[in-house]
Amino acid sequence: MLFTGDFETTTDVDDCRVWAWALCEIGNVDNFLYGNSIDSLMELLFNLDSKITVYFHNLKFDGEFILYWLFKNGYTFNSKRKYLNEKEFTTLISDRGVFYTIEICYYKSDTKRKTLKILDSLKILPFSIAEIAKAFSLPISKLEIDYKEKREIGHELTQSEIDYIRSDVTIAALGIEKLFEQNLKKMTTGSNAITEYKKIIGKSKFSKWFPPPVYDDDIRQSYRGGFTYLNPIYKNRDVGEGIVLDVNSLYPSVMYYNKLPYGEGIFFKGKYEHDNVYDLYIQMFSCQFVLKKDKIPTVQLKNNLAFVPTEYITNSGGEYVTMCMTNIDLELFLEHYEVFDINYISGWKFKSSDKLFKEYIDKWNGIKVKATKEKNKPMRTISKLMLNSLYGKFALNPNVQSKYPYLGEDNIVHYRLGPQETREPIYIPVGTFVTSWARYKTITSAQKVFDRFIYADTDSLHLVGTNPPENLDISDTELGCWKIESHFRRARFLRQKSYVEDEYCDIEDIEKYINDNPDLVNHIDLNNNTILKITCAGMPSSCYKYVNWDNFKIGNEFAGKLKISHTTGGIVLLDSPHTLRE
């Protein structure tokens, strides 16, 4: 049987416990169970006469209560996942503290073993519960309760509390059911995507195209994320009217149209020499450099103590810097910087094709277009997940390290690092070239509108002025084209991923916004028909109601943030202000 699960917990560090739990069967949401202690939940699960899997949404939180219960009830942690004995459990927790699974063996005989598997639904539905309800057009929505109300041990749940927790597990169950209907049953969205891709092209073709590279470490040095950059002349400045452009499906579009590597790479020394067959390459080189006038910087140096890893740099400071780039990034680098004393060290070259992912993207983009026309939000949501989750799986890091839980002398669950482990990589060349082409699209587009350019974030451009750029391909629907997403009356950009825009909206959108966000009516300006849209890395949406145009400034604090505190019993969320920092 498959269930979704949820805990409601106290907010007192001296009395941390589960005061309510709920289960909802996936595929049969009328099967709803609830109780008021973690003891009663575990007793129920261990007495169900079938193989049980429970999905908690954000297992990192709920999972710690389960781990504490296991330790206090005589269970022992075993890092060897395949060899669990009775009253042993194992976990899959990354070195960064990301929870994937908890597996518990609660009965074992010579002929039978009973286990309970607990997974994180956030890994397959990367949205909040409220967002899942909207994204899948579910007939129910997330409710509200007073989290801080004092609830004694044995508290009998009120009907409103039952309704609240039932809505949460039901929404998650219905969302997961939609995925299962498409046979998407893996542990993460990336695993679902690559499994589907293998079905489409065939496992033998996959193995031929993407042999696991023994040179993963070399290629991985060229792997970077999306391009996010604030034009310094607009930092901490109020900006007048402008527009926001988004690429229609950036990563799927570069996978569809651009040449990507396949097959075994060939190592070369020195500078790459033109090769009609092996026409994509990774180049290691060293040089000094200075940004050219009126050019956007394209270089970040992640593993060099002389530079801030998140900043795009304008010069090498008179030092020789060693870098590793795809030929796509290298082309941009040489175009945007004056380069001195370049020394080409070595690299890897690859065959290429622009047809590797066409069939996969044709299928899921077709589903997305059809779902959009039919206003089928569940299928549109699933198709977007499948389109955007594939490329990252190719960049899976083979060097991993888990965290192991233990109960400390302070009666609190702690985590220690396990040994370094190695798993087989998939094919990092695809991951690095997909992200490289995506950066190329965004950077070259921003450079074309340099005189208007304010800010870029992966697949978006924010520009001064309201006229559509004539030198960019504009379309509301065409894959890889720029779409005019919004028009703002004014904006303020503090730093990367931290800005507000007074966005023009029609009356219908304003009414819908009020209905969906009753706490945020202070963001609406009916005189100008605008809504204050907030983007702020690290600031939870619970802070937004305290933000306005005047106070969105460096140094200001905002209530509404919850800080995790590990304590006896599990985790307590404590009120903590969010401060806007440089």
Identify the function of each model-found stretch:
Residues M1-L2, V13-V54, E64-E582:
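Conserved acidic
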Residues T10:
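Conserved Rossmann-like nucleotide-cofactor binding loop
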Residues F56-L59:
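A short beta-strand-to-loop transition that corresponds to the Sensor-1 phosphate-sensing loop
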